[in-house]
Amino acid sequence: MTKTVTRAGGASGPQQFQSGGETMKYEITRRRFLAASSAVLAAPAIVTMVRPARAGTTLTLGHGAAPGNPRTVAAAKFAELVAEKTAGRVTINVAGAETLGSDAAMLTSLRTGALDVTANSQGATSALVPELAALGLPFLFENTAKAMQVLGGPVGAELVKRFEAVGVVPLDWWDNGIRHLTNSKRKVAAPAEVSGMKIRTPADPMTMDIFQALGAATEQIAFGELYVALQQGVVDGQENPLANIDSSKLYEVNKYISLTGHKWESTPFLMSQIAQARLGGDLEAVKAAAKEAGELQRKLSADKDAEVLAAFRRISAIEVTEVDREGFAKATASVVESRRSPSGISSPRSNRQPKAEALSAREHPMKSLSNLVELTARAIVWFARQVVIFSGIALMVFMTANVAARYVLAGGGFSFAQELPVLIFPWFILGGIVLAAHSGGHMAVEWIYDKLRDGARSTAFVAANLVSAGAFLMLGYQAYLVGEIAGIEHSPVLQLPNSVGYFALAVGSVLVAIVTLAVALRVLRLGWDHRTNTESGEVAL
């Protein structure tokens, strides 16, 4: 059906454009709009046509390591081996240095199929398979070789089953090294010398418990922000393998390096089951490439540690200290004991988590309510993620098609395509706010929290979240009232009520309030260290 447009001062009818004395008529039709949209969507295919033709599958591998890290080198080798072993049928695109987000964000992408492969951190993946955290018990392994013996046996086989149950396939167990302590304050050789320091750890309950057992205060800071945090004195020290300390140049801001060797960590090399299903007959070749790349990564990691340690010892500005490992092991024995059960080491949870598991009968209703709210919040987050993805795609398609119609087809644009972005954009924004709220990303005055400790800090956080939830509920109610009034008027082309944007704000505000309450209940029940959802929050190296 042809849409007629009335120009100012004139007649109704098709738009007319004067060019060189001739009148060209363009009728703005839905058929023309579909043609323009098809042109936009076909653009990637056109680009592909001018490249050398190569049928096959392309997978994306994400990791968080910096250039020069053994993980980075091994990821590139994996891509090379896959291309070689599949005769080019499978291509691996590697994205390192957290370009695809934090380790936890990449795990979320892996499970949804947005990411195919990741070399991830043990702390982040323990959120999916809690039993994996047992590998990080203090002073459990002296070296990688002993850890690999365990992973090559029944323990490793059971871990594979646990990962497969959550939609993920372990291709290999890479090495994240033996971890050591660095700081800017003083030489540390004995456990008592750690007491009183503020140490950055990943958002990994095991590592947090180790340093709290040593008397340190722990702070969770994204790995990409760690150098600046150390430089500015936000924290006194941190713990990482020597390879990470070197590749991220942390020694420049932490001159004291203590060879604590307090824990070993794996780097689970994971593929989504969605990606696995796409590989067909090439799956075995990809698995073989992963094993070969894993052997290289572990060798590079061991070589790098030895090389870096020798280099650190030669630099006069760096003080490397051998520590009383037996003393450190005794000082952190409580971390192991807190995870014991009559049958041995239990599923490794933080020693703060039994607080939730030991609820009395009268507290169980609160736990049930908290679980219900948390499940509701997860469903809302899934919905919000789909809203962001599809509204973002719709915005891009409609706006690009409108530009194509206006400037490529010289048709003056599509009136209804100009209206749609205005209606879609509020949903896009509110979806993003829901995701931020679920990750504990509300605007907050962090320095106030830094001045508080333990229960006071958790209480302040819960109170702030309750205020935020109340404010969003009030905002949603007001948006609903305004929406009812605005609904009287309609858009000129699509004839949609003008209340759509206001109702988007109302719905989004309610969803934000729910996920905010879920975060508050989580902290109220489990404590300060659980304010960030470990599946979607910031968990780094």
UniProtKB/Swiss-Prot annotation:
Keywords on record: Cell membrane, Membrane, Plasmid, Signal, Transmembrane, Transmembrane helix, Transport
One GO term describing the cellular component: plasma membrane
Bias kind Low complexity: ranges: 341-351
PTM text: Predicted to be exported by the Tat system. The position of the signal peptide cleavage has not been experimentally proven.
Disulfide bonds: none
Keyword Cell membrane: yes
Protein topology in the membrane: Multi-pass membrane protein
Biological process per Gene Ontology, one example term: transmembrane transport
Pfam family of the protein (one): DctQ
Transmembrane segments: 379-399, 420-440, 466-486, 500-520
Domain of life: Bacteria
InterPro entries registered for this protein in UniProt: DctP_fam, DctQ, TAT_signal, TRAP_DctP, TRAP_DctP_sf
Gene3D superfamilies: Bacterial extracellular solute-binding protein, family 7 (3.40.190.170)
Secretion signal span: 1-55
Primary residence: membrane
Cellular compartments annotated: Cell membrane
Residue segments, region Disordered: 339-362
Annotated family: Belongs to the bacterial solute-binding protein 7 family.
UniProt name for this protein: Uncharacterized protein y4mM
